[in-house]
Amino acid sequence: LILQEYIPGDDNCMRVLNAYCGLDHKVKLMALGRPLLEEQTPEGIGNYAAILSDPEYNDAALLEKLKNFLEDMQWEGFANMDIKYDARTGEYKMFEMNPRQGRSSYFVTAAGYNLSKWLVEDVLEHKELGLTIADTKSLWMIAPYGVIKKYLKDPDLLARADKLKKEGKCAHQLFCKEDWNLKRWLWYIRSQLNYYRKTARYYGNKGLRD
């Protein structure tokens, strides 16, 4: 049994960090995303439905602390961290760290930083790599934008997401025109429509009761 302090706050109080540490145990890449909305279903709890990348949210003190944490452990490879901002104390609380890429880690590639590039250049090409901190703006999503627009309650974040979508600086996890065929198209439409149904059903309790 693991007991964890309850940290109040909406889904957008979360932060997600994806990092890569080289064979020399030094951090080579850090990409901090701000989730806009999480999955709401029982089986989806803990997964993100939309993530905003914006250098304005790159908290320098937080990134430095996480960098030192990884290097002090002599970490090697990928690290995926879930963190939440506690408005009561003004501090960030780490929930967990996974030794792998996360389900939503494509948000890093969507921002222009392909995680695999750092792995290949470090392990296979033996390049000397410094620290890169992702600093571009982009919107990653797996849910349809209509769901995000309806359930994201923060007007400032919604305005930022709207702007990125209008500028074409967004990526959808499941949309890949090179893979397109009729069967996939029908599955994709069904999957996206289902987000409206299941989010309406579980929003506010995340499947803890029906």
Per-region residue spans from a language model:
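Peripheral (often C-terminal) accessory segments that flank ATP-dependent C-N-forming ligase machineries
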Residues: 121-210
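A short glycine-rich, hydrophobically flanked beta-strand micro-motif that places a catalytic Asp/Glu
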Residues: 4-5, 76-88
